[in-house]
Structures are given as structure tokens and as C-alpha cells.
């Protein structure tokens, strides 16, 4: 991107927190004064102290992007996580389901008039599950450098030239790559790693496609293919070295009642003595 875009993004990211962020409880206020009047030290809220779901989405995603793409100011990740914590704590209705349209500054739901509803012309699933989807992508692929699996069920002949594009979002060029593909639970190798395009085979029925996208240069990944009767079946990819072994251990520790493992090493490149001994 142009350097001017980066500069402007940083200007906005640095200006918003002192003006519109609740630095005590997390989250972003609905409406704030844009300027300070003579003698004022703090930006004033307009009409009320409510926090709307839309501002939380924009704030959370913006700061995850800034943290993941530039990684030059630790406060960007802090603002993203504080906003996430407030949203998860107060905007989700854990009893009846759904997302509140508005809450007060302290998190109490604001349920008056048209804002008591959880869906409207300006609030839909696009705004709620999009936040979950993109926040997971940015935090995993860009911030914490964790691989992610995505699932598709394309109809036969439903895509031009049978090309299935699986990039989850517009991410910085070269930051992620398509590492592995499975079709109907079987490894599949006809795909473009950097372009993240799967060349689908001819079929007369919908295909079950699973892809693993990971940060570029990750070096190793362990993917759980199935877990039945205490046996976990994993597909390993890359180089299993002493430094990468904790990644494999982490995946194993997620399973309760594990009694044995079966390992698919088709995509393994190397494994050192530490890996073999483990």
C-alpha cells in the first residue's frame, strides 16, 4: 500500500482512543464530540453514554488489523482485546441468544424503542458473525500466527473452471499460504499454495472440501483429522523439530481421553531425534 495510507491509518488509530474509547471498561462510545472547546481537556459524549454494536465491530477489527499488519505499537493489540472483552461480556445475550443493539457504558442492555430488537435493517448476521469470523482470522493468522481450517461444500460445476478460491479475506501479500487440502476426508494436492485456489475434480455431487491456511513460514502444523474411541488421527506437515514440538503437544493436549495416535506423515519434510523420541 501507499506510504500515505499507512501514515493516515496510524493517525486515526492514535487519535481515536483518547476521544472515543472507554479506557476504564473497554469498548467504544456511540457518539462523541469531534473537537475540544476552549478550556476542555476531555472529549464530551453526545446525548448519552451508550455503546452501539456497530462501533464495537469497527473498533475491534481495526485494531486487530493494525496489530497484525504493522505490529509496531503494543497498545493496538490491547485496544483490540479490551474491546473484544467488553463485547463478549456485555453485548451477547447468554440467556436468550443474539446480540444487543445498544448497551450503556457499564454494559447494561439498552432495550427501549426500536433498539430493543436484535435484528433490523441496520443490524443483521452479517454484522455479528462477520465480526467473529474476521476477528478470528486477524488474531490467528496475523497476530498469534496460528493455522486455521476452513470448510466448503461446492456444488458440481458451480465454479468457473472448477476453481475454488479459499482466501478468507484480503490479507497482506505473502503473509499466509494454503498449506493442505482434503476432499471428502482424503488428502488432495491440486491447489495453488500462494494464490489459495483449489482446482476441484470433476464430480456429479457436492464435495466436502477442507483447507488449512497458515501464516507463511510457519514450518510445521499438526491437523486433527478424526478422534474416535480414544484414537486421534493427525496429519503432520513440515519440519517437526525441537522448537516446533510444543505445537504438536498443544494439539494433543486438546483431546480428552486420548489413548493413542495415528500419524499421517505424507507431507512431512524432516523430523529430528526429539520428535521421534516424543
Predicted regions and their residues:
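Residue-level preference for short coil/turn positions at secondary-structure junctions
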Residues: 55, 229-230, 257
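Hydrophobic beta-strand residues in large extracellular and virion-surface proteins
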Residues: 181, 209-211, 222, 234, ...
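Amphipathic alpha-helical interaction surfaces in cytosolic regulatory modules
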Residues: 239-278
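Glycan-recognition and catalytic cores of secretory/periplasmic carbohydrate-active enzymes
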Residues: 1-217
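Short glycine/serine/threonine-biased micro-segments
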Residues: 24, 236, 273
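Short beta-strand/loop segment at the start of cytosolic alpha/beta domains
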Residues: 218-235
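Secondary-structure boundary/capping motif
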Residues: 207, 235, 269-270
Amino acid at each position: 500500500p501507499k506510504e500515505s495510507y499507512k501514515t493516515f491509518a496510524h493517525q486515526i488509530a492514535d487519535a481515536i482512543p483518547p476521544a472515543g474509547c472507554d479506557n476504564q471498561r473497554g469498548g467504544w462510545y456511540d457518539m462523541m464530540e469531534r473537537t475540544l472547546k476552549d478550556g476542555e481537556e476531555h472529549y464530551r459524549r453526545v446525548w448519552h453514554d451508550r455503546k452501539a454494536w456497530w462501533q464495537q465491530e469497527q473498533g475491534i477489527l481495526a485494531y486487530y488489523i493494525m496489530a497484525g499488519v504493522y505490529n509496531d505499537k503494543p497498545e493496538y493489540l490491547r485496544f483490540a482485546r479490551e474491546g473484544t472483552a467488553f463485547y463478549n461480556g456485555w453485548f451477547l445475550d447468554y440467556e436468550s441468544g443474539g446480540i444487543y443493539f445498544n448497551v450503556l457504558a457499564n454494559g447494561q442492555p439498552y432495550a427501549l424503542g426500536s433498539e430493543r430488537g436484535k435484528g433490523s435493517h441496520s443490524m443483521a448476521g452479517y454484522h455479528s458473525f462477520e465480526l467473529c469470523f474476521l476477528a478470528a482470522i486477524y488474531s490467528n493468522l496475523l497476530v498469534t500466527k496460528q493455522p486455521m481450517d476452513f470448510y466448503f461444500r461446492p456444488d458440481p460445476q458451480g465454479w468457473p473452471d472448477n476453481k475454488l478460491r479459499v482466501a478468507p479475506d484480503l490479507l497482506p501479500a505473502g503473509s499466509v499460504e494454503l498449506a493442505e487440502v482434503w476432499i471428502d476426508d482424503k488428502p488432495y494436492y491440486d491447489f495453488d499454495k500462494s494464490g489459495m485456489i483449489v482446482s476441484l475434480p470433476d464430480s456429479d455431487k457436492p464435495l466436502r472440501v477442507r483447507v488449512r491456511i497458515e501464516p507463511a513460514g510457519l514450518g510445521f502444523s499438526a491437523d486433527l483429522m478424526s478422534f474416535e474411541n480414544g484414537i486421534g488421527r493427525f496429519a503432520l506437515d513440515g519440519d517437526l523439530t525441537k522448537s516446533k514440538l510444543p505445537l504438536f503437544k498443544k494439539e494433543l493436549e486438546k483431546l480428552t481421553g486420548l489413548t493413542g495416535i495415528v500419524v499421517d506423515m505424507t507431507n512431512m519434510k524432516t523430523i529430528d531425534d526429539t520428535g521421534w523420541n516424543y
